[in-house]
């Protein structure tokens, strides 16, 4: 809405009676704000102005300005917060996350398409169509845009995260933001994401039509056509229609999830979680579950049918959000359901993994030469992208200093900095003040300027070099319904661990239910969920039995504290 310049009609100070009305409107529009917070937003005596303007499309908008920054705007009698206001109240709206690469498109007036979303470990926030939402970037929870949800969370998951997700109204760096002090978003609770995922998703944004701008009216149609073409094709050997095949697959995944993945302790269970975390993971290899291609079209309609068969009971525990509250595990359809056998390939892999005990990989830190450091390394025959060990970097620095006669004659522990070393190792403000550096500082600065990489060598396999830092095994505690705690562990595959085997071992050790589900926001990765706080058992398994170094495991501090004996 504010991607282009707007025209200001008037700018007036707000009177006392209008301030009181605005406070009441803010409290009604954002009920989660306390009285003190509302009073802080709409102060009694400080400067507060009303700016009436026309957006570039002709929309009449009223903007409320406090302390020189726009904090609210009103459109068609609806109040919306600006990014300036959301930076002080980041949890005011349900927040969805996207990639930093996407922001430029949003600022240019594009709407956010669902393929551009990053799904956090806790799942997507629960919203209904038309709800006001905030949009943040990976690495920072501070909102950079606000928009209106084009569909509910359930519909987003049912669609397989395809289509238009949010109609964007206002963004950081648009013309409304420019009318304020132009401050940058604060750093709030950064999200941890696998660098490999970030690179993969950047490539997907460039290739796929994730965003649809104002001029691209037919972008969503093209996207839906592309996804339909790449979806599940009808089996030519099956005489049934695609809809009939999808109905059977839907019921198979549903019954499989109830029989193997869901425990009584998991109830009540959000219907969106049932689909996203359980049913999708029960889909057989080579098939794709798409409810829209079934006769039910929507998950809610399918669950109504299952409720009529008295398999489950579904209730709306909060407005617009349905949950499965009861399951009849003695129902004939569940008891008679036969779990599909895995493929021969997966069976042989699992059997082979049982024969040999787990041995941890050898992980060696490496360094890549970036473009900014090529001048320093080209004398030794290296170029941009060359991968080096730390000892090699140290040797190259020493040889460079000696070859160019940079060792200080009066103090052999110091190295004089020539123009190449200055450009490569010093910050701009240091280049006129630092003329010499000790050897250790010289090498340390060089290592910090290089890009991280690592080499993983599994027993009996060839070494594999990857860019970025290896993601540690991540252990977190999450709160589920009725204040029940669960332990969630991710990134096991990076260390050659099979999540299914780890889950089975923990189930026996902890005497607690375990589930293996797709890790939200991580491509082709699984996470293990264990009932209760099982960090202590998990730590013993990883450290003492699997012999993984402690530095590659994060979250061990969440283990319950030992009770003191009286």
Curated annotation (Swiss-Prot):
It comes from the Eukaryota. The keyword Secreted does not apply. Residues 93-173 form the PUA domain. Keywords: Acetylation, Cytoplasm, Initiation factor, Phosphoprotein, Protein biosynthesis. Residues 211-239 are annotated as: Disordered. Its main location: cytoplasm. GO terms for molecular function: RNA binding; translation initiation factor activity. The modification Phosphoserine is found at residue 343. GO terms for biological process: formation of translation preinitiation complex. One of its GO terms (cellular component) is cytoplasm. Residues 365-449 form the SWIB/MDM2 domain. It is found in: Cytoplasm. Residues 473-546 form the SUI1 domain. Pfam families: Pre-PUA, SUI1, WH_eIF2D. Translation initiation factor that is able to deliver tRNA to the P-site of the eukaryotic ribosome in a GTP-independent manner. The binding of Met-tRNA(I) occurs after the AUG codon finds its position in the P-site of 40S ribosomes, the situation that takes place during initiation complex formation on some specific RNAs. Its activity in tRNA binding with 40S subunits does not require the presence of the aminoacyl moiety. Possesses the unique ability to deliver non-Met (elongator) tRNAs into the P-site of the 40S subunit. Belongs to the eIF2D family. This is Eukaryotic translation initiation factor 2D. The lineage of its organism: Eukaryota, Metazoa, Chordata, Craniata, Vertebrata.
